[in-house]
């Protein structure tokens, strides 16, 4: 089951009822779960805190695995384009959280950098697709990479869940979000 909510506030109010709705929709109980997968960030401070606290609580109380997935990886894996996929999340003050993905794998570690530094790292690349929170950066991206695809997309909880099925679980107590 999959549900998508795009809300700016009150994650703490809507998250558990949404989980409950999804579980009931597919006739599952919490005891049927064997793993909790959560976006580990980067992202909204409050949104990440709510999601991670909920995920840790569920994993701990149900004594099941917990897995964290990069929000940038989720953005990249939503894209089905050839070449380098560059997911971007606005970090304010002309800085971004950025990843570099090719063939479904991270080509570099996720970074926090100025947009100019990111564009400089990519010089010489022919086939680049920028995904994520790109609207504020579209003009600068198009000036440097006029042939690039630039797609405004959000991370998909479904994709995060898919990716998380393949990853190694983490210690529930040690897990912290990546802001």
What are the roles of these predicted feature ranges?
Residues 26-31, 122-126, 168:
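Glycine-rich phosphate-binding loop signature in dinucleotide/nucleotide-binding domains
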Residues 149-179:
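Acyltransferase
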Residues 10, 65-155:
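Surface "functional belts" at beta-alpha junctions
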Residues 25-31, 60-69:
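Phosphate-handling active-site elements
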Residues 1-40, 112:
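N-terminal beta-alpha supersecondary unit
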Residues 6-17, 45-49, 53, 70, ...:
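Residues at secondary-structure transition points
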Residues 35-66:
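DPxDG-like acidic metal-binding loop motif
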């Amino acid at each position: 089951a999959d549900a998508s909510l795009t809300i700016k506030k009150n994650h703490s109010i809507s998250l558990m009822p949404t989980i409950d709705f999804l579980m009931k929709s597919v006739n599952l109980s919490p005891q049927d779960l064997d793993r909790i997968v959560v976006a580990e960030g980067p992202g909204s401070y409050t949104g990440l805190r709510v999601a991670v606290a909920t995920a840790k609580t569920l994993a701990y109380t149900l004594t099941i695995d917990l897995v964290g997935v990069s929000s940038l990886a989720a953005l990249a894996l939503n894209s089905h384009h050839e070449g380098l996929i560059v997911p971007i999340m606005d970090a304010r003050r002309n800085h971004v959280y950025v990843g570099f993905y090719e063939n479904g794998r991270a080509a570099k570690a996720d970074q926090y950098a100025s947009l100019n530094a990111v564009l400089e790292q990519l010089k010489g690349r022919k086939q680049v697709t920028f995904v994520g929170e790109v609207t504020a950066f579209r003009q600068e991206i198009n000036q440097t990479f006029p042939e690039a695809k630039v797609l405004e997309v959000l991370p998909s909880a479904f994709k995060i869940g898919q990716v998380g099925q393949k990853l190694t679980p983490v210690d529930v107590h040690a897990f912290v979000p990546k802001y």
